[in-house]
Structures are given as structure tokens and as C-alpha cells.
Regions:
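Single conserved hydrophobic/aromatic residue that forms the stacking wall/gate
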Residues: 1-7, 11
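Extended hydrophobic/Leu-rich segments
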Residues: 10-14, 32, 52
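Alpha-helical transmembrane signal-anchor/signal-peptide segments
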Residues: 13-29
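Extracytoplasmic/periplasmic soluble domains downstream of a signal peptide or transmembrane helix
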Residues: 15, 64-180
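Membrane-proximal extracellular/periplasmic loop immediately following the first transmembrane helix
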Residues: 29-35
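Extended boundary segments
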Residues: 35-82
């Protein structure tokens, strides 16, 4: 046998090791998942629903369409299936309280009588808060039902750092400011 043939045999018997390194790029599968989620976020372009303003707690935030996990990473989301502003029903919007920019971090400071504005299309809808409640997360869907009036309902997790309950702030439509 010649030496190149012997070297070739040794090479063939070595296990194939791709990405062999002392410093792996990903320490755990969890890190890889985080990277994968980041890639999904970069690819995802949410549809903007409107602009939400709550002056008393310094909220001035774009609202996206949808309340799925990915959409809510970009800001508050309009519950699909709830009404559009000015259409004679309940407009539902959910937002995070402690993560992803925490757009509703101070929602618990809103009081009855506070003003909330939602710009949708070319109109600005003015709402006055008339109801604040805390409901169980598993049974609180009724807060999004239509009550026979034009209203806006905001929901977020309650208490902070928990998903057990929902803080629900609701307001009645008082005025539509035309942008035309």
C-alpha cells in the first residue's frame, strides 16, 4: 500500500463532522428558536389599522390588524371580527402591558372620563372612557360583544407579569372629526 491510499482509508473511516468547533454558534436549541423568531419578525410586515392616542397616559401608538402573537409584537392589535370605528359596534384592541414595547403599560391609570382617540382612515374618532373592569382571562370574551352603541374596548393582561386576568377599558364614541 502506498501512503496516500492509507491516508484515504483513514479519512473514510472518520465520522463526518460538519460545523466542528470549540465555540458553537448556538449553545442551545432555545437560542436557535430565538434567532428563528427574529427572522420571522423581520420578514413580517403588519398591516397598520390606525393610530391610538390616550393623552392622559402618554400613549401615541400605531395599531396593527390582528391580535396574533406576531402582530402584537409590533404594537396594539385590532381584534379581527370586532367592528370598525363609526360602524355602530364595539372596536376591540389588545396590547401588551410588559413586553414588546409595553404599549398598555399604564392602562391601569386610565380613569372614567378620560379621552381616547383612534384615527382610522381619514377620520379621528373621539371616545370617553365610561367603563373599567378586570375580568377572568378565560371567560372575558364578552367584553368585545356589541352593546348596541359605538364604542372602543382596550384589553391587556392583568396584573402586571400575569395572564390570569384582563384589564378592560371601554369608552363611548362622542365625536368624529373628519379628516377631509
Amino acid at each position: 500500500r502506498n501512503s496516500s491510499s492509507a491516508a484515504s482509508d483513514v479519512y473514510k473511516r472518520q465520522p463526518l463532522r460538519l460545523f466542528q468547533t470549540d465555540n458553537p454558534v448556538f449553545e442551545t436549541l432555545q437560542e436557535l428558536t430565538v434567532i428563528d423568531q427574529s427572522a420571522k419578525i423581520e420578514e413580517f410586515q403588519p398591516e397598520i389599522f390606525g393610530l391610538l392616542e390616550i393623552p392622559d397616559i402618554n400613549v401615541n401608538q400605531y395599531v396593527v390588524s390582528g391580535t396574533d402573537e406576531l402582530s402584537l409584537q409590533f404594537g396594539p392589535g385590532h381584534y379581527l371580527g370586532t367592528k370598525l370605528p363609526g360602524s355602530g359596534g364595539n372596536v376591540g384592541i389588545a396590547g401588551h402591558r410588559t413586553t414588546y414595547g409595553a404599549p398598555f403599560s399604564r392602562l391601569d391609570l386610565v380613569e372614567i372620563g378620560d379621552e381616547i382617540y383612534l384615527t382610522y382612515g381619514s377620520n379621528k374618532y373621539h371616545y370617553i372612557v365610561d367603563d373599567i373592569e378586570v375580568v377572568d382571562a378565560n371567560t372575558g370574551d364578552y367584553v368585545l360583544f356589541n352593546r348596541g352603541d359605538d364604542r372602543l374596548t382596550l384589553t391587556t393582561c392583568h396584573p402586571r407579569y400575569s395572564a390570569r386576568q384582563r384589564l378592560v377599558v371601554s369608552g363611548i364614541l362622542t365625536r368624529i372629526e373628519s379628516g377631509n
